[in-house]
């Protein structure tokens, strides 16, 4: 970590683009910063800020290990990473939901009961094994988690799994694959996170940025200030 720079890790993609809009609204420099460019670092010496453009799944790692002081990441990614960081502010954008989904016909045959649905095969396909395992363990439902890297909706059709755990925004993809939501897990939005050591050592400087982002995001209440 470069000591004279405050380093902020940003995710590539739509979430990163929304994050840049928030940073600009908070009065932070973003001129020329692009989350889809080949350039992966952007430095502004005058205010002493550097941005790292990362894969969304890597943002918690950069923050946890001190390569970045702060980071913006989806709660879904943060929960799956299990990173030891401070979760400071719910930024409110990038909304999606974690859900358990099943084939419509099987759900009806099971009397719309998750326990009945799991009476036979207990395979669950997901890109988020940590989140999925936690959900079923908390309910005392033994399952076999199968990790996939994409197109989770294919798993029930191919006979690989009976249930899936995935994130949805509109639910359109589930409907197109004749899947229905059978249980909510939690809602996800973008979060501002901080390296635990950096937040304590550079508390005053980081707090000024945190408060500016809170105001820009319309967060008038207290910071979340939890760890994962």
Swiss-Prot record:
Taxonomy, superkingdom: Bacteria
Locations listed in the record: Cytoplasm
Pfam families: HisG (PF01634)
GO biological process: L-histidine biosynthetic process
PANTHER family for this protein: ATP PHOSPHORIBOSYLTRANSFERASE, ATP PHOSPHORIBOSYLTRANSFERASE ATP-PRTASE
Recorded domain comment: Lacks the C-terminal regulatory region which is replaced by HisZ.
Subunit (UniProt): Heteromultimer composed of HisG and HisZ subunits.
Name of the featured protein: ATP phosphoribosyltransferase
């Amino acid at each position: 970590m470069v000591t004279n720079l405050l380093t902020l890790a940003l995710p590539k993609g739509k979430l990163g683009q929304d994050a840049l809009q928030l940073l600009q609204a908070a009065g932070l420099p973003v001129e020329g910063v692009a989350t889809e460019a080949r350039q992966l670092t952007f430095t502004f010496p005058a205010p002493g800020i550097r941005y790292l453009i990362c894969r969304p799944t890597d943002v918690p790692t950069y923050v946890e290990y001190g390569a970045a002081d702060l980071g913006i990441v989806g709660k879904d990614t943060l929960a799956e990473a299990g990173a030891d960081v401070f979760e400071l502010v719910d930024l409110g954008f990038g909304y999606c939901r974690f859900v358990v989904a099943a084939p419509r016909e099987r759900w009806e045959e099971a009397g719309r009961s998750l326990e009945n649905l799991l009476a036979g095969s207990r395979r669950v396909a997901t890109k988020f094994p940590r989140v999925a395992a936690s959900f079923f363990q908390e309910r005392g439902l033994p399952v076999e988690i199968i990790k996939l890297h994409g197109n989770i909706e294919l798993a029930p059709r191919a006979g690989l799994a009976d249930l899936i755990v995935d994130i949805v925004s509109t639910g359109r993809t589930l409907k197109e694959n004749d899947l229905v939501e059978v249980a909510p897990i939690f809602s996800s939005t973008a979060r501002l996170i901080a390296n635990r050591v950096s937040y304590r050592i550079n508390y005053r400087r980081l707090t000024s940025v945190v408060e500016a982002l809170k105001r820009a995001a319309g967060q008038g209440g207290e910071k979340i200030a939890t760890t994962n």
